[in-house]
Design a protein with these regions (language model features):
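Residues at the C-termini of beta-strands that transition into short coil/loop
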Residues: 13-15, 86, 142
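Short loop/helix-cap segments at secondary-structure boundaries that form the rim of catalytic
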Residues: 3-4, 73-79, 147-148
Length: 151
């Protein structure tokens, strides 16, 4: 469940079992922004359900902080505009081409493209790794972006 931080800011704490990230929710007068997409379709579904249970509107926009799997692998699950920085999107375009079989994952650890911890958590979050879907964000920015959610 999301914890109320202020009248307009809510935080869902991380879940270390499968490395689900802290997720922020900002409620503007007109729009709501979810900060971090979750690490899977299942994580995104849980976030959606928790927002509904708490009477919070579904996000109009989803933004991610960086490309790491726990922050970005749920991006495809949101049917709203998504936002990421240029370097993050470049990396997501690269990662979406990765294979997720054991050998490919082990090879990325050897080449230091990834780490054992992430592989273990990905395998735990995705019993069926064919379900991994990596996408870049719809909106890409360089340096800064201003989003008016309505006061």
């Amino acid at each position: 469940m999301f914890k109320k931080f202020s009248d307009n800011i809510y935080i869902q704490p991380a879940d270390g079992y499968t490395d689900r990230p802290n997720v922020g929710y900002i409620k503007g007068e007109k729009y709501a922004l979810l900060f971090e997409s979750g690490n899977s379709q299942a994580n995104a579904n849980l976030l959606r359900d928790d927002l509904e249970k708490q009477g919070l509107k579904q996000p109009d926009i989803v933004a991610i902080f960086h490309w790491h799997w726990d922050h970005s692998f749920g991006l495809h699950a949101w049917n709203v505009p998504t936002i990421a920085g240029r370097k993050t999107n470049e990396k997501l375009r690269e990662v979406r081409l990765w294979e997720w079989d054991d050998a490919s994952m082990a090879k990325r650890v050897e080449t230091k493209e990834d780490i054992v911890f992430c592989n273990e958590m990905i395998k735990r979050e995705y019993p069926d790794r064919s379900q991994i879907k990596v996408v870049p964000a719809d909106i890409e920015f360089t340096d800064t972006i201003k989003i008016d959610l309505g006061a």
